[in-house]
Amino acid sequence: DVTIQVLVQCRPDLIKRTYEACAGAPKVIVHFYNSTSILQRRVVFRADRDEIKKIATDGARKCLEEAAKHPGTRWRYEYSPESYTGTELEYAKEVCDAVSEVIAPTPDWPLIVNLPATVEMATPNVYADSIEWMSRNLARRDSIILSLHPHNDRGTAVAAAELGFQAG
């Protein structure tokens, strides 16, 4: 009983190719992501909040579109607001909620929402506090699996993971 998991940016051409590569697999988790951080919105994308949210929801729609072409596979989804810890908390929730609205998860077919500390920017308790807040405030929470993804830039990933787990 094996499930393949793949990671892909919210870029239509890459999403299409990812589904082609997974064709024939019985079970696949497609983990799609886009950066939502203040810095990357300004410097990398030169885009506002609505434009960044649209990248995420367009990615979710493209995933569903490609999945429909491969009905023999049991598809599941995971979404990451990349650089979550550099993103305003309320905005990260807004983007995750918009993605979950498109994916329409259920308790029996949940969406995984991965919350990465892509760059560790604060102490582990700050990350844990954000996990607790997201856990309490995400829409469709009964149909969401929260995934913690601390990085170890400052040497505190284990502490961030443990505190985040306790918090959410």
Language-model features: locations:
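N-terminal capping/small domains of soluble enzymes
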Residues: D1-P12
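Active-site-adjacent loop and "lid" segments of alpha/beta metabolic enzymes
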Residues: P150-T156
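A short, small-residue-rich loop immediately preceding and capping a beta-strand
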Residues: Q5, I144-P150, A167
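Short beta-strand segments
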Residues: L7, H31-S35, H149
